[in-house]
């Protein structure tokens, strides 16, 4: 059964056999992440946890003729954030949904154009893959607003780019351009805005050629703490060694080798 997004207002959902595209669509506020968007992401995650598929998250597409610049997400909705208090912070409104996205069974791709700032950047960090356009700007301006980057940047960012650069972004307000993000491997590919989604789908196609169960288990094991290895690797391999896909794919490989 396909996902029902008929009541959605912040996300536009497109679904195919092996993937879902979630396009954030609040251009009037630069795709600020508000409670409605968070709720819609939670509903989508519930579906993807039950029906594992690749997820591509993107924002408003650039349209030069209409004067529309590309926007991933400019951060949390400041109007809502201004009114949040201690109990809201302890509830982890944004951090909880970003962690849920990160834990989805199948890989998540962030296709980023324009601003990915604050919570928008933290959403991108939660993805397994990040590709972008030459117009991307990524950073953490939270301390300038009197708060901290508490939805993932304080721990994910140093794992992604190293502690010195992470501190520059978090404590000194550094904003990365596309070339810097690519050099730091924060993004792995750059595409022109008109080719960004084609690049995201090409990456999804490569993932889709792999065995889905092997991908799911490998993603899960990859995120395990160091002390869990190698025991968790061996248990995961034991599961895969009994899968029909393992026998079918290895036999197909051997058959191709015989023909050469």
Label each PLM-derived region with a short phrase.
Residues 32-35, 74, 83, 171, ...:
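Phosphate-coordinating loops and pocket residues in cytosolic domains that bind phosphorylated ligands
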Residues 1-17, 48, 61-67, 173, ...:
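C-terminal alpha-helix plus adjacent terminal tail
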Residues 82-92:
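A short acidic, glycine-rich active-site loop
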Residues 3-11, 99-212:
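Crotonase-fold acyl-CoA enzyme core
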Residues 17-25, 36-84, 100-110, 129, ...:
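A structural preference for short, pocket-lining loop segments at secondary-structure junctions
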Residues 93-97, 153-156, 165, 217, ...:
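Hydrophobic alpha-helical segments typical of transmembrane helices
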Residues 37-40, 93, 196, 233:
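Hydrophobic alpha-helical membrane-association signature
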């Amino acid at each position: 059964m396909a996902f029902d997004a008929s009541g959605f207002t912040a996300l536009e959902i497109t679904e195919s056999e092996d993937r879902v595209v979630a396009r954030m669509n609040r251009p009037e506020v630069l795709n600020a992440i508000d409670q409605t968007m968070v709720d819609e992401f939670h509903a989508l995650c519930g579906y993807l946890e039950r029906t594992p598929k690749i997820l591509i998250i993107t924002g408003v597409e650039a349209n030069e003729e209409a004067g529309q610049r590309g926007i991933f997400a400019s951060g949390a909705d400041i109007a809502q954030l201004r009114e949040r208090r201690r109990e809201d912070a302890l509830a982890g409104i944004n951090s909880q949904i970003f962690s849920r996205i990160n834990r989805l069974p199948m890989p998540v791709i962030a296709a980023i154009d324009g601003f990915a700032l604050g919570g928008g950047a933290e959403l991108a960090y939660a993805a397994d893959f990040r590709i972008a356009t030459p117009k991307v700007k990524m950073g953490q301006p939270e301390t300038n607003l009197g708060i901290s980057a508490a939805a993932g940047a304080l721990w994910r960012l140093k794992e992604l780019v190293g502690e010195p650069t992470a501190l520059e972004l978090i404590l000194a307000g550094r904003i990365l351009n596309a070339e810097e993000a690519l050099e730091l491997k924060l993004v792995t590919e750059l595409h022109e805005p008109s080719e960004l989604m084609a690049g995201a789908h090409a990456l999804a196609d490569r993932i889709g050629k792999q065995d889905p169960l092997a991908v799911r288990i490998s993603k899960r094991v990859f995120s395990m703490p160091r002390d869990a290895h190698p025991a968790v690797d061996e248990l995961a391999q034991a599961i895969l060694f009994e899968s029909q896909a393992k026998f079918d794919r290895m036999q197909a490989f051997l058959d191709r080798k015989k023909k050469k």
